[in-house]
Amino acid sequence: MARKRTLGGKAPQAGNKVSHSQRKTRRQWMPNIQTKALWSITLGQSVKVTISTSALRSVDNAGGLDNYLLKILPSELTPSMRRVARQIRERKAAA
């Protein structure tokens, strides 16, 4: 699975693995990315996202996907999530 996320803002980190003898070997630490279907109450449907586990906790703390997308800056979202956030804003404004 590609380590690309639609929510979460995490990217692979690079660094050195250091052994007991202090030999340094380059390596990458990959974020814990999961594919989930999160329910949008406003849209009345599920939205499939690839999300880091820390962002999944943030979604839970915000009270759901709708509140999280309304709270986060649009510049931190991918184009597909910006589209979903715009749909949520339009539905909430119409209601």
UniProtKB/Swiss-Prot annotation:
UniProt similarity note: Belongs to the bacterial ribosomal protein bL28 family.
InterPro entries: Ribosomal_bL28 (IPR026569), Ribosomal_bL28/bL31-like_sf (IPR034704), Ribosomal_bL28_bact-type (IPR001383), Ribosomal_bL28_sf (IPR037147)
Keyword Transmembrane helix in annotation: no
Ranges for region Disordered: 1-28
Domain of life: Bacteria
Gene3D superfamilies linked: Ribosomal protein L28/L24
Species of origin: Magnetococcus marinus (strain ATCC BAA-1437 / JCM 17883 / MC-1)
Keyword tags: Ribonucleoprotein, Ribosomal protein
GO terms, biological process: translation
Any single GO CC term annotated in Swiss-Prot or TrEMBL for this entry: ribosome
One Gene Ontology molecular-function label: structural constituent of ribosome
The protein, known as: Large ribosomal subunit protein bL28
Claim: Ribosomal protein is one of the keywords in the record: yes
Pfam families reported for this sequence: Ribosomal_L28
